[in-house]
Amino acid sequence: ISIRLVGSEMCIRDRNWCLNKKAEFKKLILMFQKEVADRIIAKVNTKDYSRITILANWKFNIKKIFDISPECFSPKPKIESTLLEFIPKKNIIKIRNPKNLENITKIFFSQRRKMVKKNMIRLFKNFESLTNKIDIKLTDRPQNISVDKFLILVKEYENQSN
């Protein structure tokens, strides 16, 4: 699918095109399965807060537009959908390698019910001073750590790897 409206800022493209190209845009409107959308827009300290929340919210301000009932489609799916608006953030916390964010969140959320202490000790030489510096308790669980704090952890990880 590729639709371009002349004189407009709207461009509708196949999702794979958007992911494989460096495109500049002011806003993205994307539809997701409701359960996935709930994870993307989840707040810290909630059960839906996860890796996908952090990865999506690193570069975007995201808000829910509305839910879409299965009755709106033909054939009718068995799931509900949600439309989300993604607006690129003007000021993001810069990290050298996005793979580090992916890897660190993967490590932390692979045992989401465990306290972060073991992962902090495993990843950071100076974990005690780091937890004080960014106000993370070793008894916290991954879903208690904000997106910005995860980004600071990644920056610290990259700095110690030099």
Feature-to-residue mapping (PLM):
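Short, Lys/Arg-enriched alpha-helical microdomains
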Residues: 150
